[in-house]
Amino acid sequence: MSRASSRSSWTIGLLTLLLAGIFSGCATSTRQSAASDRMMIPTTGTRGMSCCAMAKGVPRQTALAKTAVRFVGQSRIQVGGRSYNPDCSGFVRGVYASQRVDLYSGLGELDGGNGVGRIYTHMVEHGRIHYGPTVHPGDLVFFHNTWDFNGDGLPNDPLTHIGVVEKVEPDGTVLFVSSLSRGIERYRMNLQHPDIHKTTDGRVFNDFLRRKRFGDGVGTHYLAGQLFAAFGTLSH
């Protein structure tokens, strides 16, 4: 099977499971059923060795990136008089709401479900899921395995984190904005060097998105490039 066919099959399969409602996002606490806990979902990040280069954004995409940056350093997410949950999915939902885009459109309000998965589903239906090599300002960036949601000690937790792309640096490092426990900050990801945190001259290629914990299983990764799942570009 070709790489493109494999990616397509994986995306369709993942979307089917998302619509079945078995995944959880970065800020939820509802546990999966015992049956779904036993399911082994392929969650190894896609390595984009030719990624990434910056594509010129249309005005709405540029506005999304600028809005995301304005939230850096803040702990509250309020847009148009409405407050959003101070987690990763709430953050990106608020950013997109600034351009009158509801990332939960047609999916109902989140009630103990999966925020990141719902946004992924929206992007599949109303945009494009891809792996580069070009990235637009305001694109969404999805990650797997940023925490052990199902508690089984294995790196089999899909779509656990999300951020908004700000820009791509000349060396291919993607700068994105996201909300973690320490607030809304900028982070870096370099898919050409996914296993490198910092170079010998001090440049950061990949920030840590997962905390190291006692008992982490074999194959557990921690850097943004290692945990990368996909990009999402909304249709114009």
Regions found by a protein language model. Give the residues of each.
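N-terminal capping segments
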Residues: 27-109, 219-236
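Aromatic- and glycine-rich peptidoglycan recognition patches
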Residues: 27-34, 151-236
